[in-house]
Amino acid sequence: MTRKQRRLLMIGGAGVVLVVAVGLVLNAMRGSIVFFSTPKMVSEQQIGAGTRFRLGGVVEPGSLHRGDQLAVSFKVSDGAATVPVAFKGILPDLFREGQGVIAEGALDTAGVFKADTVLAKHDETYMPKEVADALKKQGHWKDDYEKKPPGAPGASADAAGPSR
């Protein structure tokens, strides 16, 4: 075997090892990757039962129902579509109707989103980029969503009021 053939064999072997390593990493990450969807995206796409994703939107007013023990059901809306959500656990303190929420879980066969994690909007200026984009696209965006309260990070000096 010539020197050139050995070099090509080494490069080919290294390429095979690299492809196998990338394949193993992607296979291991498949279970931990969670995609974000809005209710409209869920209704338009055929997301199969059992597929994990994050559902983001606003808790629809009047939809919150507390059941036995820690069972809670509510609806998440983005203004264009609504998805029913079932959750068993302790809700965040800031969770309420009309507020932003992100729930992580999967759809069941009846089309109910079974959440195992619920995150509430943590301040009045936070809105996930995907939810903001969806609201803008559907024409439900309000300009006051972008206004920051005085003293908030990124608020203008004029909005902060007089300094001491």
From Swiss-Prot:
Residue ranges annotated as Cytoplasmic topological domain: 1-7
Its main subcellular localisation, reduced to a broad class, is: membrane
Know the name of this protein? Answer: Cytochrome c-type biogenesis protein CcmE
**Where along the chain is composition biased (Low complexity)?**
153-164
The family database entries (InterPro entries) matched by this protein are listed as:
CcmE, CcmE-like_sf, NA-bd_OB-fold
Q: Which gene encodes it?
A: ccmE
Record membrane topology: Single-pass type II membrane protein
Instruction: Please note every region of biased composition (Basic and acidic residues).
Output: 137-149
Lineage, uppermost ranks: Bacteria, Pseudomonadati, Pseudomonadota, Alphaproteobacteria, Hyphomicrobiales
Which residues participate in heme binding?
H122, Y126
Report the locations given in the UniProt record.
Cell inner membrane
Keyword Membrane recorded:
yes
Disordered: annotated segments: 137-164
> Periplasmic side of the membrane: what ranges?
29-164
Q: Which UniProt keywords apply?
A: Cell inner membrane, Cell membrane, Cytochrome c-type biogenesis, Heme, Iron, Membrane, Metal-binding, Signal-anchor, Transmembrane, Transmembrane helix
